[in-house]
Structures are given as C-alpha cells and as structure tokens.
C-alpha cells in the first residue's frame, strides 16, 4: 500500500501529495518522501537539499522564487506547524498555462504537500502565527541561478487570503513581469 496519493492540480505537472499516516494509540507515522513511491509517480530526480523555514507573522508572504536552468529544481513543500497558502506559478515559456497560479492550503493537520515541478515559481502566505515549512529540493541553491517575481504583481493576480504583510526588502524589490518583459524559462 502506498503511503501517498498523487493528485494532479489545475496546472500541468503540479501535484498535490496527500500523505497517509499510520495511526495508533501512541500517535502516528507519516512519510514525507520515499524514493520508490515518487519514482512510480514519475519523479526520478534525487533529493539533494532539505530546508526548513519559520515564518513568525500571520499574513507574511515569502516568494515568488525559482532557479533558472541548469539549476531548475523540483520542490516538495510540506507544513510542519501552522497553516499556509502555498502557491506555484507556471513560468515555463511555452506552457499553455504560462503565468497562471495554483494555491493549496498546507498544514500539519491535513498532511498535504505540494510537489512543484521545474519551471514554476514558488511562494506562500502564513495563515497562522509561527508557520514552519520543510522543503525537499532536487537541486542545491545556486545564487547565480536565482530568479524571482513579485508576489503583489497585478499581472499574476494571486488571491492572497490575507493582507500581504512582513514582506522582506528582497521580496519587495522583485520585479513585476510587465516591467521586465518576462518571457519565462525554457527547460
């Protein structure tokens, strides 16, 4: 029996992963990742880096980050504490859903993860105080390959459920797609 359900979202290749827990009177065991199960779902690149974030303020937003090829990455994002709206934006130049976004509520309670493919930008908004996320990456961080879009860009029309607060200076300064004539990434 697989410990995961892989559910296709409204955007191509972007998947919601529902983790199934084994529960008993002591609590539960839940897998975040299993190389065999993910390979069966078509994800064959190895995990090479794992990051954890803590976002203290409700309404705070991080993102929208991505890495340019050849360091484009798949990310598996899960919430360890609190609740977030996790958002992925399709930035693949030739995609029929170019610049469209999809969001999912992730929480420790719902045991959902978002599997974000290469060619997507990622960000999230904390819906509670003290949110902790864990990210599994198929590429290490390369500052020279870093890219980002502005979370408040009207061209993206992301429907953040709370007022956007506590945006880092760095994230505030990310460009709007129209200001830089953003053409997307080619994988």
What is the meaning of each model-derived region?
Residues 1-109, 130, 137-187:
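Non-catalytic, conserved peripheral segments adjacent to functional cores
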Residues 106-129:
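Conserved metal-binding segment of the jelly-roll/cupin
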């Amino acid at each position: 029996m697989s410990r995961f359900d892989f559910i296709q979202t409204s955007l191509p290749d972007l998947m919601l992963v529902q983790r199934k827990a084994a529960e008993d009177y002591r609590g539960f065991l839940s897998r975040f990742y299993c190389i065999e199960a993910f390979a069966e779902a078509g994800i064959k690149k190895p995990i090479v880096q794992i990051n954890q974030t803590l976002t203290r303020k409700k309404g705070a937003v991080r993102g929208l980050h991505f890495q340019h090829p050849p360091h484009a990455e798949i990310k598996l994002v899960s919430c360890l504490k609190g609740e977030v709206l996790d958002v992925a934006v399709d930035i693949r130049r030739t995609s029929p859903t170019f610049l469209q976004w999809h969001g999912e509520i992730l929480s420790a309670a719902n045991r959902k993860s978002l599997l974000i493919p290469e060619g997507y930008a990622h960000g999230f908004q904390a819906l509670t105080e003290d949110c902790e996320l864990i990210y599994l990456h198929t590429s290490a961080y390369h500052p020279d390959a870093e890219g980002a879009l502005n979370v408040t860009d009207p061209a993206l029309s992301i429907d953040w459920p709370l007022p956007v607060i506590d945006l880092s200076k760095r994230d505030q300064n990310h460009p709007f797609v129209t200001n830089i004539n953003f053409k997307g990434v080619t994988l």
